[in-house]
């Protein structure tokens, strides 16, 4: 085991050692690390759940590893329904991030089950679905009463999801100057152009500066040319 050799050579370890072992599903490594005094924290359970390693999660929890809402959120983000169900049945808490992480991962079935089981959500569910480009998830969330705010448009602009931004605006999602700023900083000129043509407010100086700093010169040039001609 490489970890044994590293420890024999005096290499330090910390909570992250157990977390990484859990993420990789390396139960024997995790067991050896714990038997030899390696610390752990909540991220061991979160990482195991996120990558679907139920046996690792079960061993960790049985042996006293702390867990928090991140365990359910991690399982939801990874779309690991069996892990999520086990975690809930064994006392793991959840919160709004559980729905948000499911939406961000595009896991429609998981999100539906969460809501049917009473898991709370908030505006982050919509913004994370938007960031991931998951239009169907966003549409279902809105149809089911999930709130949204300006972060939904900002997230679509940040990731360049023009079709999703168009749908959000057509359905009343608010936006602010951060929509243009995020489009500019990530080089999504088509998103920026559409947003401005449809009345999105902006700080053109900020957009131009960010684009220049990132070497996105086509965006910077367009902003400079259109700073006056567009409202």
What are these regions (language model features)?
Residues 1-231:
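Ankyrin repeat (ANK) tandem alpha-helical domains that serve as protein-protein interaction scaffolds
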């Amino acid at each position: 085991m490489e970890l044994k050799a590293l420890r024999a050579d005096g290499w330090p370890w910390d909570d992250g050692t157990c977390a990484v072992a859990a993420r990789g599903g390396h139960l024997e490594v995790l067991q050896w690390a714990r038997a030899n005094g390696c610390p752990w924290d909540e991220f061991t359970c979160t990482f195991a759940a996120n990558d679907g390693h139920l046996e690792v999660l079960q061993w960790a929890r049985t042996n006293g590893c702390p867990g928090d809402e991140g365990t359910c959120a991690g399982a939801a983000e990874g779309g690991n329904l069996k892990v999520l169900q086990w975690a809930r049945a064994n006392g793991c808490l959840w919160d709004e991030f559980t729905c948000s992480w499911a939406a961000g991962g595009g896991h429609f079935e998981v999100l539906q089950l969460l809501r049917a089981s009473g898991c709370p959500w908030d505006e982050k569910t919509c913004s994370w679905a938007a960031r991931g480009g998951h239009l169907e998830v966003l549409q279902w969330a809105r149809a089911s009463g999930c709130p949204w705010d300006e972060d939904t448009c900002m997230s679509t602009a940040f990731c360049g999801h023009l079709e999703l931004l168009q749908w959000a605006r057509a359905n009343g999602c608010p936006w602010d100057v951060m929509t243009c700023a995020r489009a500019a900083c990530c080089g999504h000129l088509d998103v920026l152009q559409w947003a401005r043509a449809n009345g999105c407010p902006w700080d053109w100086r900020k957009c131009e500066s960010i684009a220049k700093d990132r070497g996105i010169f086509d965006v910077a040039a367009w902003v400079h040319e259109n700073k006056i001609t567009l409202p």
